[in-house]
Amino acid sequence: MTTVSEALKAFRDSGAKYLDLRFTDVKGKWQHLTMDGTVVDEDLLNNGVFFDGSSIAGWKAINESDMVLKPDLSTTVMDPFTAQPTMMIFCDILDAVTKEPYERDPRGTAKKAEEYVKSSGMGDTVYIGPEAEFFVFDDVKFQVEMNKSSFEIDSAEGPYNSAKNYESGNLGHRPGIKGGYFPVPPVDSAQDIRTEFLEELKNLGLRMEKHHHEVAPSQHELGLLFDTLLKQGDGIQLYKYGVHMVANSFGKTATFMPKPVKGDNGSGMHVHQSIWKDGKPLFAGDGYAGLSETALHYIGGIIKHGKALNAFTNPSTNSYKRLIPGFEAPVILVYSARNRSASCRIPVSDSPKGKRVEVRFPDPTANPYLAFAAMLMAGMDGIKNKIHPGDASDQDLYELSDSEVAKLPTVCGSLREALEAVDQDRAFLTEAGVFTDDQIDGYIDLKMQEVYDLEHSPHPVEFKNYFSV
């Protein structure tokens, strides 16, 4: 554990002129407060900094707004994008009066989830491996007004630009619909920017493995190596920040929206998960696909609570434009070895250490701390109550008829449905106080505002379908 004096020395030795206090709001957006280096001392690092919590959506009311940003001294990293040398540090949120962890702090929830596994005796380490996909565009415009609503995206890779007149000429090399996985350049025009993504993410302290073009034009993925749950929550925040900043430096813009384009694949965030104890993987065994009973029960918990999990793993109205048949989205709550159409997949591994469960329905609009913690709690409920997931489904689920699909459990069809599901199925989350009822109620209220916003807004497709009726 890093001491206050060690952290202060590291800050001064780094040459940083500023300390950027980073924290995550309920929706998963990274926020920050920058301190001048001349005021950074042991007292600040030990006691934190007061701030106005009422300005953060879903947190405290203005009459009880004081909160504390408490630095986690083990999480310092230099920001490679600032003009002046700046050190970033992750912060936890404390109540200003009690100095206790604030129960709506997402990072605090992730910490409690890890502690729950340890205190249960079922394991001591939770490993997470997220695969966050994203799009990179050249230009994006959108507006939502009383009398007009529209968006327009543009990318040189877009098949809609095959006849466009460019000043330098239209060279023609671009992936078609569902054609991005994965030809070499010049069809793949993003080799250099993806390499730069990887380099800067390594500069941010992340352990990177690979990069590649994804299925849709302008869509990409960077391989982030697995780590413990809390560290991967931090890692996804660094990942998103790095992608946004590098894209900006190239004069482009990146988005983690699940479905920004019509008629092609959306962006998911498949999450690989495993539990270990005493240095041994608990998911390896001699059952189906080399799984242990513990792993099967973990899957059982994920499937049982799948609809409630959607509130955290797929927390945007846009999420459910991705979770539809026909675009490689896993909408059926079953499990399988190798079968990528299942919502829970067992990846091939030659080693027991690599035995894990891949949950495929999450997307990168998720708050990583809440999503990872919620899936862990669902899996732990499955282990605790020995919830068996039933037989595996090794057939291509995309080929099933509507009547066959109707007999199988599926993910939610809308954010409203997901919020209603977690409202009714929350006991597994509140076990040992990992999540609290107040936290879940506040989350539902906040996300329902997004539901209302969409449901109360006329859509251009409605004009196309109904204006002349």
What are these regions (language model features)?
Residues 1-469:
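Glycine-rich, acidic/polar active-site loops that bind/position phosphate-bearing ligands
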